[in-house]
Amino acid sequence: MATAAQGPLSLLWGWLWSERFWLPENVSWADLEGPADGYGYPRGRHILSVFPLAAGIFFVRLLFERFIAKPCALCIGIEDSGPYQAQPNAILEKVFISITKYPDKKRLEGLSKQLDWNVRKIQCWFRHRRNQDKPPTLTKFCESMWRFTFYLCIFCYGIRFLWSSPWFWDIRQCWHNYPFQPLSSGLYHYYIMELAFYWSLMFSQFTDIKRKDFLIMFVHHLVTIGLISFSYINNMVRVGTLIMCLHDVSDFLLEAAKLANYAKYQRLCDTLFVIFSAVFMVTRLGIYPFWILNTTLFESWEIIGPYASWWLLNGLLLTLQLLHVIWSYLIARIALKALIRGKVSKDDRSDVESSSEEEDVTTCTKSPCDSSSSNGANRVNGHMGGSYWAEE
């Protein structure tokens, strides 16, 4: 029975690590056991070290947000308070939780008769209640400051490492003598740190502020983790370092623009957004397809030829390019709105509520509906926070 149980597992294990899938023709795992010096060649078991490192990165993030990001936010005037709290009302709360967060005209009129409130005041209550669930600016600032710090540090490390790497200056070096390209210490740490960070993002996105592009980001993290893992196991790490560095250069600029927006430094935010947009378009729609995809699809075919995992890796790279196109469209929409409004006010991929609703709430708090009702209900007063940036 034990043998029977082991049989399917052995077949599954053999299929997962099939040399026909992972490696070019006439190359076996045994060929990649050496050399003895340095880190040798990439091995699948190296990936296991990523998970404790990802947990460590998440723990460092908690400390960073608590003891560095939060004091910085308070120092520049970001308040440690959430949005206005809607006045308690059991009937409206039950409707909000159980029935709808956006009552139609008929329901509003029914609630108006039931509570002896005018319709405008009930609309105000629902708007306040929806915004009550929004995260405070302080939380968003801390999250962005952590990502900005990591992306900036890893980009500086990556560009310093690549500057002395021959494939940075001649991309065809990514495929010369492939797959017999031993790992250096710098390359190993660069790869493992990036992979651990994206694993930490994969788990933390379920506890972070929820964005409208949650599903897109989930796919992005899956594709990124898949790309880094696959390229490491089959030793396409040279081209992998170029891809990671290319993405990090615009990521930290986006986070910097969001930080300026949260801090209400509008002119700085606009400037950083313009720089980010230019860098994003050049790197994601220019350098990535015409330099990276060109070498993975055509130059690698010419030098080493296609094999099973080659097809999968290029499929993931093309999926990533599709995401680049989607994000470029969203960035273009923001830029168009910025030209019309005269400033960058909100990312189309931002939190659940829209900017138009925020404006309605601000108007609501200034309208006569804030006065007490005839049955002696407490006065509705408060304010709405300013515009806020989104998560990439």
From Swiss-Prot:
GO terms for biological process: ceramide biosynthetic process; oligodendrocyte development; sphingolipid biosynthetic process. Residues 1-46 are lumenal. Residues 332-392 are cytoplasmic. Pathway: Lipid metabolism; sphingolipid metabolism. The keyword Protein biosynthesis does not apply. Residues 362-378 have a biased composition (Polar residues). Inhibited by fumonisin B1. Residues 75-136 are annotated as: Homeobox-like. The last loop motif confers selectivity toward palmitoyl-CoA (hexadecanoyl-CoA; C16:0-CoA) as acyl donor. This is Ceramide synthase 5. It comes from Homo sapiens (Human). The gene is CERS5.
